Amino acid sequence: MSWDEMYRDAYERVLNSIGKIKGVMLAYNTNIDAIKYLKREDLERRIEEAGKDEVLRYSDELPKKINTIQQLLGSILWSVKRGKAAELLVEDREVRNYMRQWGWDELRMGGQVGIMANLLGGVYGIPVIAHVPQISKLQASLFLDGPIYVPTFEEGLKLVHPRNFEGNEEDCIHYIYEFPRGFKVLNFTAPRENRFIGAADDYNPRLYIRKEWVERFEEIAERAELAIVSGLHSLTEETYREPIKVVREHLKVLKDLNIKTHLEFAFTADEKVRREILGLLSLVYSVGLNEVELASVLEIMNERELADRILAKDPADPVAVIEGLMKLIEEGVERIHFHTYGYYLAITKYRGEHVRDALLFSALAAATKAMLGNIEKLDDLRKGLEVPIGRQGLEVYEVVKREFNVEKGIGEVGDYQIAFVPTKIVEKPKSTVGIGDTISSSAFVSEFSLSS
């Protein structure tokens, strides 16, 4: 069976099974994305005005957070130079005003929870319960129609669509600076499309958890059979203690209720927070991450040389990646889903073709989102079937076949199963925002639907 045939078969199988899922809890980060498509002349002018030498300093090493315009522009350059995504908290009010005046090209649903809620609930039709730190009218308006709910406790637990929530709280805006592959600024050229995110938000970056989610969490959790947890990445050494304590308690509740929980990584600047997140892995069933996130976790596990090997090539060297994933799975999870440009991998303690098929479905969802900008209905994924499989992933597959005896995307590594898929590549994507969340949530829920 060819890869194209496997893609088509996986799509049909998931289409028939995804309706079985009774409910997914999503916590914790939801916000509004203000997307700006970068223009060379505009960015270079701003760099000159801010002081080029100071800006370039931050293009070499990211600050922990943003308090000056130079740090903002330097962080954008950091992402452009490497073609890598990054996200930092913008603390300073003047920098926030600067970003607001710089403006945006479009407003969209943002935050990992918000993006996944619209995909799982609005497109796939799976009931979801979403944690929304601040339910403003603008935030609520960005949720799609469908079985998307937030909990209220006026007369016992009641689930309502965010647009039916009584009240109007604050807007949490994240400014996203997108650039295409080949984007040129100063003497830098972006090796691939990506973005830098500046979070002008006093809630999500410190992992604000709503009172009802702290006091009545078990009641909310009982309405779900799966959970996806994200949003820990913006915490710092100063802010992590109380939120991590609450998250740990929530994960224990989910584990006691036998709810399979997926923890989605994102770029985490603070080393102490990375260490704390690593300490949560024994409480979750599954983890999702990309090459930058894997390397950053391996660094705190004293595996710096391995981390460097993972980042040395594009696409990431699969032998180094699998070596890194094997170290990470020893922290106690059942499943690790790795996604990078060109291919996805899953290392699992259990076996079955459904793991590979879930990766294929998620790659189809990612290609469709890249091609269309947004997925509006499940049938849109048929268009993704026409996107060609990337040369890079097929080349990596030859290495994986040789090194790990993989056939039809499935093999063994030690006591674990390895599933591999080369991904479909959209040469000129409309947007990269939310593609990682699309990949991880689609793979997790579709794998569960195929196995149940």
From Swiss-Prot:
Domain ADPK per the UniProt entry, residue ranges: 1-452
- Residues recorded as binding Mg(2+), renumbered to this chain, are E264, E293, D437
The positions annotated for binding D-glucose are D33, E87, G111, Q112, H174, D437
Question: What GO annotations for molecular function exist for this entry?
Answer: ADP-specific glucokinase activity; glucokinase activity; magnesium ion binding
Kindly list the positions annotated as binding ADP: N290, H339, T340, V426, G436
Query: What are the required cofactors?
Result: Mg(2+)
Q: Which GO terms describe its biological process?
A: glucose metabolic process; glycolytic process
Localization (cell): Cytoplasm
Instruction: Indicate the enzyme's highest-level EC class.
Output: transferase
GO cellular component annotations of the record: cytoplasm
Q: Does the keyword Magnesium apply?
A: yes
- What's noted on cofactor binding? Binds 1 Mg(2+) ion per subunit.
Is the keyword Cytoplasm in the record? yes
What does this chain do?
Answer: Catalyzes the ADP-dependent phosphorylation of D-glucose to D-glucose 6-phosphate and glucosamine to glucosamine 6-phosphate.
Task: Name the family.
Answer: Belongs to the ADP-dependent glucokinase family.
Protein known as? ADP-dependent glucose/glucosamine kinase
Which species is this record about? Pyrococcus abyssi (strain GE5 / Orsay)
